[in-house]
Swiss-Prot record:
Catalytically driven reaction(s): (1S,2R)-1-C-(indol-3-yl)glycerol 3-phosphate + L-serine = D-glyceraldehyde 3-phosphate + L-tryptophan + H2O
Protein name in UniProt: Tryptophan synthase beta chain 2
Entry keyword Lyase: yes
Cofactor: pyridoxal 5'-phosphate
Complex and partners: Tetramer of two alpha and two beta chains.
Name of the encoding gene: trpB2
GO molecular function, one term: tryptophan synthase activity
């Protein structure tokens, strides 16, 4: 029995996997709103490299050498662990594995795309990147990536998370990022939101609008997105491609794969290489997207065209949405407080390839504490959603006696999210 499966540096995937040509039905194209030029504005805020990847129908896209060098520097490939302690705690015949994206220097999967986006922006002559962040994982990753690529970085951090997680601001600043709470006085849209509500908690949709507004108005400034779009999920497929090799080494075939979803990047990156096998009839695996009960995009949203941001600056995307003006409750899983979803993930849910479940905040912290006690690793509140669903599935196996193989995308650690755990332990959640 292998408790940890580690790959060599030379086993980092050489290419990213693009699921677009393998989707079960064509992906609906982005649209302009009536009278708008949102699509035409994209080359003003995104680098050529990521825009080409966004619409590409090539199945495999080579990872540039400079990006590969940084992947090695930050510790890829990441290990796959067997959760023996959790299995014993639950007394389940299921075998549980978790892919350790928390091994990254910034503590989550986000660097996989931050490095690539910063590389392509620098190649285009950008001097600065603007972005949004919820819990701070994405802002932290882009701050480091910009530092490594000799770029400036400005992060609009959702106000409720800015207040909940002060050390996230510190680490972003340590890497050279400028951090402002969103909504802010730095943009016209932010000022409008604050005028309506001076205590506005913010949302990812608002922060995206602010970051895009700044990028549109200034020269040599690009916008960088942490989730949702195809190029982001494409970069994250290094997770799933590595996991595939590691499960083969362990002699395992996954029966259930689980990840948390906000915009869908860690989940999509983890499962897309396996989704292709399922669509090709080579794999019988259930894919479960775990989302917050307070922001139930997949389980309660509508499948329709909507903006990716609150101000309506992005093109209209066909996805599950709660409405671009939806402001989620101020939960601790700030990285999942998003109204929309990756169009690819949304289409696969619509087609019945992916299932979705919504989990309440109290339950996710209960699951996180169990995992920490069993495995010694403190999961991020976002990651706890996936762990909670995995625990439910492992308990079902205990009842049925089935020896299923369950794989969790462990998207990040929670060492900078301890206020949420503290509130849970003190009975405030």
């Amino acid at each position: 029995m292998m408790n940890k499966i580690v790959l060599d540096e030379n086993e980092i995937p050489k290419k990213w996997y693009n699921i677009n040509p393998d989707l079960p039905s064509p992906l609906p194209e982005p649209k302009n709103p009536e009278g708008g030029k949102n699509i035409e504005n994209l080359p003003r805020v995104f680098s050529r490299g990521v825009l080409e990847q966004e619409m590409s129908m090539e199945r495999w896209i080579k990872i540039p050498r400079e990006v590969m060098d940084v992947y090695k520097m930050i510790g890829r490939p990441t290990p796959l662990f067997r959760a023996k302690g959790l299995e014993e705690m639950l007394d389940t015949p299921a075998r549980i594995y978790y892919k350790r994206e928390d091994y990254s220097p910034t503590g989550s999967h986000k660097l996989n795309t931050a490095i690539a986006q910063a590389y392509y922006a620098r190649k285009d002559g950008a001097e600065r990147l603007t972005t949004e962040t919820g819990a701070g994982q994405w802002g932290t990753a882009l701050s480091l990536a910009c530092s490594l690529m000799d770029l400036q970085c400005k992060v609009y951090m959702v106000r409720v998370s800015f207040n909940q997680k002060p050390f996230r601001k510190t680490i972003m600043q340590l890497y050279g990022g400028e951090v402002v709470p969103s909504p802010s006085n730095h943009t016209e849209f932010g000022r409008r939101m604050l005028k309506e509500d001076p205590e506005h908690p913010g949302s990812l949709g608002i922060a995206i609008s602010e970051a895009m507004e700044e990028a549109l108005q200034e020269e040599n400034v690009y916008y960088s997105l942490g989730s949702v779009l195809n190029h982001v999920l494409l970069h994250q497929t290094v997770i799933g491609l590595e996991t595939k090799k590691q499960l083969e080494i362990a002699g395992e075939t996954p029966d259930i794969m689980i990840g948390c979803v906000g915009g869908g990047s860690n989940f999509g990156g983890a499962i897309f290489p396996f989704v292709k096998d399922k669509l090709d009839g080579k794999l019988d695996c259930e894919f479960i997207a775990a989302e917050p009960k307070s922001c139930p995009t997949l389980t309660a949203g509508e499948y329709r065209y909507d903006f990716g941001d609150t101000a309506g600056m992005t093109p209209l995307l066909k996805m599950y949405t709660l409405g671009h003006d939806f402001v989620p409750p101020s939960v601790h899983a700030g990285g999942l407080r998003y109204h929309g979803m990756s169009p690819q993930v949304a289409l696969l849910v619509r087609e019945g390839v992916i299932n979705a479940r919504a989990v309440p905040q109290h339950t996710i912290f209960e699951s996180g504490v169990k995992f920490a006690k069993a495995e010694g690793v403190v999961p991020a509140p976002e990651t706890c959603h996936a762990i909670s669903v995995a625990i439910d599935e492992a308990r079902k196996c205990r009842e049925t006696g089935e020896e299923k193989t369950i794989v969790i995308s462990f998207s990040g650690h929670g060492l900078l999210d301890l206020k949420g755990y503290g509130d849970y332990l003190e009975g405030k959640i």
